[in-house]
Amino acid sequence: MMEVGILPVHVLYVFFIGAIILFMLLRKDTTFISLFGIFIISLWASHSLSASVSSLFHSFIYAAGELLPTIFIICFIVSMSDLLTKTGINEAMISPFASLVRGPVTAYWLIGGLMFAISLFFWPSPGVALIGAVLLPAAARAGLTPLAAAMAMNLFGHGFALSGDFVIQAAPKLTADAAGIPVGDVVSASIPLVLIMGVTTTTAAFIMIQRERKKQEHPTSFSPVLSGEQDNSLYLPKRLRSILAFLIPLAFLADIACMLLFNLQGNDATALIGGSAICILFTVHFFVYKHKGLEKITGYFIDGFKFGFKVFGPVIPIAAFFYLGDSGYESILGTSLPKGSHGIVNDLGIALSHMMPMSKELAATALTAAGAITGLDGSGFSGISLAGSIAKLFSSALHADPAILTALGQISAIWVGGGTLVPWALIPAAAICKVDPFELARKNFIPVAIGLLVTTLAAVMML
């Protein structure tokens, strides 16, 4: 039985969700409409202009506070990865695999597998440069086409690994917060869906590549583009590089073992990975700079913070709007929820279940579509909170597990916008393989569409 009716504040919230979706479809920046929505809803709820103006600042403080652990871990991972690249340790980690590239088939799966592993721990951006420098020349000699190499890097890194984000947990944090559920629930629910999506898509892409390769009498050869002259001035001695290249992955594997052993999830897991990254950064840093180490470390942190806030700058305003629909209402607006309300999104979900027949099929399709729409800006992250919010709405109406729908929306958003279908998100992989990003997006479309269809059907069966 409904405890609270649909009030003007609910109508305003739905209106601005629609406006945000429209802005995304038109590929417009969502920051203005998100903040304008917070202002108008606050003005209606508080009847105070000064409180409404203050709510804009409070919304940033609230959203940043919720996201700060995630932002920081991205900063520290990027700082560490930058130093590992400059010292040659990253190259030492994967150079042994170059000798395993025997033909185009092994090249595709080896590039994909390594890109997946690197992206889980360091995110895809460092992986593109690293594999471009070490593995792509070997793949080219083995007969892998430029487009196939770009597809492997893209689908395994920016799609398969990033859509689950099991180690860093930036994506699950955003969607879980918007859905009002623990991060661990989203991670657990996403594991089978991420595997289904990843295996289906990469296999479909491989089949397409093999068919096209058989049609080509003379496969295209290529030399990967590297970003300028390689600077070896900070390279550590070969023996030390090899030792650290062995110990650093071991440290992160130990972190994963601790997560499983002590059931660490959410911020606890984030803290363990982030702390390990800081320790590795300090250790390698003192090997490189020795007595000058204290003078150099700040620069790496600054570069990491620049990257982290560049990625999450567009995320904070839209996340603030969706926090308003759940746990952040009172903190942001400084006023209580309407009597009997369980949060704007919960109320809307209950109302939706009374207004129209709801089905698992409709809910899963809606979440896949919502996720895809949020990815149209090419980041995969800026609108991902929308998927979590809609998942909560539909799960309330269905009385179903919100984690499954949340995971489905997350997967759809990141596969589309994180860098497999939106051309401007494909530029790094396309550039290093010397292919057109629009052609890469076109080749990715069929495998990703097949994957999303199969994953949506799987989610329906899991609900």
UniProtKB/Swiss-Prot annotation:
Origin, by domain of life?
Answer: Bacteria
Q: Which UniProt keywords apply?
A: Cell membrane, Membrane, Transmembrane, Transmembrane helix
Keyword rRNA-binding (UniProt): no
In the bilayer, the protein is annotated as: Multi-pass membrane protein
Major location (coarse): membrane
Asked if the Swiss-Prot or TrEMBL record annotates the protein with the keyword Transmembrane, the reply is yes
Q: Which GO terms describe its cellular component?
A: plasma membrane
Which cysteines link up through disulfide bonds?
A: none
Compartments it resides in = Cell membrane
Transmembrane ranges, per UniProt, are 6-26, 31-51, 60-80, 101-123, 130-152, 189-209, 242-262, 269-289, 304-324, 413-433, 443-463
Question: What protein am I looking at?
Answer: Uncharacterized membrane protein YhfA
**Chain's gene name:** yhfA
